[in-house]
Curated annotation (Swiss-Prot):
EC main group: oxidoreductase
Membrane topology (UniProt): Peripheral membrane protein
Lineage: Bacteria, Pseudomonadati, Pseudomonadota, Gammaproteobacteria, Enterobacterales
Entry's Gene Ontology cellular component terms: plasma membrane
Subunit structure: Heterotrimer.
Role of this protein: Part of the heterotrimer that catalyzes the conversion of D-gluconate to 2-dehydro-D-gluconate.
UniProt protein name: Gluconate 2-dehydrogenase cytochrome c subunit
Origin species: Pantoea cypripedii
Amino acid sequence: MMKSILALVLGTLSFAALADDQANDALVKRGEYLARAGDCVACHSVKGGQPFAGGLPMATPIGTIYSTNITPDKTTGIGDYSYDDFQKAVRHGVAKNGDTLYPAMPYPSYAVVSDEDMKALYAYFMHGVAPVAQANKDSDIPWPLSMRWPLAIWRGVFAPDVKAFQPAAQEDPVLARGRYLVEGLGHCGACHTPRSITMQEKALSNDGAHDYLSGSSAPIDGWTASNLRGDNRDGLGRWSEDDLRQFLRYGRNDHTAAFGGMTDVVEHSLQHLSDDDITAIARYLKSLGAKDASQTVFTQDDQVAKALWKGDDSQTGASVYVDSCAACHKTDGSRLSALLPGAAWQPGGAGEPDPTSLIHIVLTGGTLPGVQGAPTAITMPAFGWRLNDQQVADVVNFIRGSWGNGAKATVTAKDVASLRKDETVQAHQGNADIKVLEQQQ
């Protein structure tokens, strides 16, 4: 009888332990998914390095800062962080030692992340990520600008109170989920919302604020982030919800293809999200009204195409375009296939008020990553090695003024030289290879 009772007790304890292990495994797996949604690996890794080990340089107006090691290494990472330490860093912007984090860490967006999701993220980073012994790099910001106490003042003035996201009364649950992902974990506004002179985002949500997601006010690492609102020319007004779903999932659709920093978002984050979450994000973005409701829909102008078809490349920049660009982007500014962006108007591209992204991609090229469902990676070669500053300025002005793009020829050789100086280093920077991360799982 005693043996039977003992066996029953041991069996019950074993079952309970198994159930706990399964629950913990499920929590870690959920945290992994949420880390994908937050695209944590993109900033906290460098190309050729280990995922989440930090070291990615981020240029700021006052110097360069480097992302930190967020692996569970107890000496150089966050292995000795309690849950409270972790959530204070992520949602409040306060490190374990009490220092305020640089707002390159989007803690103002993460302030709405729920306790349940924070606990899952903590479980993943403590138990699902390989520890890496790699010391953090000090910033290149000179003293006295490197002092942290002004950041604490900035945080007190501009960071929102930490308050878990709550759907609005009668809000469509799909829209609510999309809003949570876009405004919270996805931190889309960190790049796509303009900032004030004091560097805070002009809006953290769409609550009566048409600045939200209306496009970056200044380049970020040499790229400008596009308007995600419903504007007809420089926004997503011409896109359907299905267009957005395709772009988010694959980084390409019938309108454009991803370039710049958005390629990392597609590769490391969006391609891994569920169909339901991709739909929720797309539906929420399509619910955003235009910032400038007076914008007319882009209309293609074929005058330049007709001239090029006749062999007339006398317009400044036209001969460079024909020699270097037309094979893929065609003489009418469209594109050879859905794998390539067109040279005619597209959000974030040829007709944008700020030409920085276009100059950047001409100089350094870019790669559209292969993703699940669209495995072919397509690379645009860099042309900075064989085009001088004046030639780059000429072809950028030609593209921006042709096919109905409507921009004036304002780019100078000096503008190109300035950006080229920065891109000499930046072109060789990047993020961790996603395959390295997948091999760890």
